[in-house]
Amino acid sequence: MKIIAKKDLFINDEIRVREVRLVGLDGEQLGIKPLSEAQAIADDANVDLVIIQPQATPPVAKIMNYGKFKFEYQKKRKEQRKKQSVVTVKEVRLSPVIDKGDFETKLRNGRKFLEKGNKVKVSIRFKGRMITHKEIGAKVLAEFAEKTQDIAIIEQRAKMDGRQMFMQLAPIPDKK
């Protein structure tokens, strides 16, 4: 059964058609019935009459407990949202002439991000005449990648973009 938003569902007294194709509690077809008879059947069973396909001719109405239906639908949606994981990209900025202590600090931050399951974009910004020594920047990025290879894979290799060189690391899927 296709789940329809509340605005598309008409329940009990909101239904404004003469006859409906009726579906019972267990999903059995009860045929085309006048609206008054369908509502009487629903009232006898102490449940709701809900139009589930208003565009059909005649509209399809189902006898169901609408409160339970709504609860199950919300529960299913909540479960789907729980299964979704949002992966964010964190950035670690380095310099081509970075000191060893600073490098270790940035490396620690990058590892923390990767352990939390985030992707890490490692970037190096070249200032002034440093741009002529791209190999120094590439060496720094290679060292960063080497020191995180136990928890990350290189998703995008080192690449130049204007005055910036960057690469992207992603956590190894089974080590989140």
UniProtKB/Swiss-Prot annotation:
**Single GO cellular component term:** membrane
Q: Which Pfam families match?
A: IF3_C, IF3_N
Q: What InterPro entries does the entry give?
A: T_IF-3_C_sf (IPR036788), T_IF-3_N_sf (IPR036787), Translation_initiation_fac3_CS (IPR019813), Translation_initiation_fac_3 (IPR001288), Translation_initiation_fac_3_C (IPR019815), Translation_initiation_fac_3_N (IPR019814)
Task: Kindly give the SUPFAM superfamilies that the UniProt entry links to this protein.
Answer: Translation initiation factor IF3, C-terminal domain (SSF55200), Translation initiation factor IF3, N-terminal domain (SSF54364)
Q: Which GO terms describe its biological process?
A: ribosome disassembly
Give the keywords, sorted: Cytoplasm, Initiation factor, Protein biosynthesis
Q: Name one GO molecular function term.
A: ribosome binding
Q: What is its main location?
A: cytoplasm
Location comes to: Cytoplasm
Entries under HAMAP family matching the protein: IF_3
PANTHER family named among the record's database cross-references: TRANSLATION INITIATION FACTOR IF-3, TRANSLATION INITIATION FACTOR IF-3, MITOCHONDRIAL
Family to which the UniProt record says this protein belongs: Belongs to the IF-3 family.
Note the subunit structure.
Monomer.
Q: Give the protein's biological function.
A: IF-3 binds to the 30S ribosomal subunit and shifts the equilibrium between 70S ribosomes and their 50S and 30S subunits in favor of the free subunits, thus enhancing the availability of 30S subunits on which protein synthesis initiation begins.
Which protein is depicted? Translation initiation factor IF-3
Native organism is Streptococcus thermophilus (strain ATCC BAA-250 / LMG 18311)
Supply the gene name.
infC
